């Protein structure tokens, strides 16, 4: 069976897609790159931007899930919505179908406005959304599930059942590592993670220059 042709590369700045499971430390790794002067686009931030009050994204969510996902001030009740979608895979798929196109379009727009020589684009659901076809290289951030559970409990206050539902809905870390070009083990010290990011930064600079040449 013939494989589908790869999409045309219509971007000019070298792109690295940064992905990983929830509470794996993606934000810290992204911050390390930003500290080195690398432009970072975080789709978690864009996911909030596309559902601000009055936006088409919020209107679509309300149409799909009802006004029960709104706070009294009309903004999105994110914890309530998260609880609903992680308890119902079909609801999660429906939400992703509503918001992923808006989020990824915003990422594309931001990417075209930012400089190079390379950019980091943080996309937690990189493969599920199909955005892996829109980057030149993939970096996976990973840590043991026990550490993810600990971080989730401390950061978000989720109970054990909710944490297990969230982790069950994620692509396993081993699967991400197998598909990614590069990997950051974020279970060690902050200094070790920074050192690894520094190594990757040099690699990405070289690849970006090769791509531009």
What positions do the PLM features span?
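Glycine-rich phosphate-binding loop of ATP-dependent small-molecule kinases
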Residues: 1-76, 198, 202-213
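An amphipathic alpha-helix signature
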Residues: 58-62, 145-153, 160, 164
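Small-molecule kinase domains that catalyze NTP-dependent phosphoryl transfer to phosphate-bearing small molecules
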Residues: 106-107, 133-134, 154-205, 212-213
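Residue-level signal for inorganic ion chemistry
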Residues: 25, 44, 95, 120, ...
């Amino acid at each position: 069976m013939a494989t589908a042709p790869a999409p045309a590369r219509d971007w000019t700045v070298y792109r690295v897609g940064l992905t990983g499971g929830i509470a794996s430390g993606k934000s810290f790794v992204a911050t390390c790159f930003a500290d080195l002067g690398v432009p970072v686009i975080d789709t978690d931030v864009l996911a909030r931007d596309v559902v601000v009050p009055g936006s088409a994204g919020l209107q679509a969510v309300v149409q799909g899930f009802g006004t029960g996902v709104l706070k009294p001030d009309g903004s999105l009740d994110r914890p309530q919505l998260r609880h609903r979608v992680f308890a119902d895979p079909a609801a999660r798929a429906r939400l992703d179908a509503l918001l992923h196109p808006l989020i990824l379009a915003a990422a594309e727009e931001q990417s075209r406005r930012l400089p190079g020589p390379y950019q980091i684009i943080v996309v937690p659901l990189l493969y599920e959304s199909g955005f892996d076809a829109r980057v030149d290289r993939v970096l996976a951030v990973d840590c043991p599930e026990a550490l993810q559970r600990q971080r989730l409990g401390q950061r978000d206050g989720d109970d054990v059942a909710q944490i297990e539902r969230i982790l069950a809905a994620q692509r396993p870390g081993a699967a991400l590592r197998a598909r990614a070009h590069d990997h950051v083990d974020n279970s060690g010290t902050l200094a070790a993670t920074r050192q690894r990011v520094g190594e990757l930064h040099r690699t990405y600079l070289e690849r970006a220059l090769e791509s531009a040449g």
